[in-house]
Amino acid sequence: ALLIVAIPVILIQLIITIVFFDSLWIKTNKGMTRALVSEIQTFIEVYSNDNYEKDDIKNIFSLYQDLNIEFIEDDDFNFSYDERWFSPIDRTLRRELKSKFALEIFWFDTTSYKELVDLRIKYQNGYFKFIVPKDRLTSTSARLFGLWITVPAFIVVIISLIFLISSFS
């Protein structure tokens, strides 16, 4: 009799959690990643304009956009690319970068630093190295969302079990 109440509630809660969490998390991360890649594209466009001082542009973007930017003069742009297809952050970043830049002119690493992403984009006779905080690409409220969904589910199950037990006595 207890299973008649508990199992449907737990199953519905699991399905709702997975569907909403997945949809919300992916949409949020996609929007954040798209904004970051657009900022990087804007930086490169402004940097290409000779009307502005290059160091001032880097300083402004570093200060206001939280981007650590360095231009490295090196004609060699052949970084070993570790494809992590099962990482949502990597997949979303790769997709957004492909939409703005050619595949062979960007490279990124999300695993070397715990809280940072190393992103490099080829530019003329070198490349830009962007060090970006990982929280610019992904929402950190996933655990909070999980608790927000799980705790009420357990409370509802416990209350329903109490009512079920009291109805038998």
What are the functions of these language-model segments?
Residues 23, 38, 48, 62, ...:
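Generic serine detector
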Residues 1-85:
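Juxtamembrane segments flanking the first transmembrane helix
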Residues 20-21, 43, 61, 71, ...:
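Phenylalanine-focused residue identity feature
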Residues 84-152:
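Extracytoplasmic
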Residues 1-26, 32, 129-169:
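Alpha-helical transmembrane segments of membrane proteins, especially the N-terminal anchoring helices
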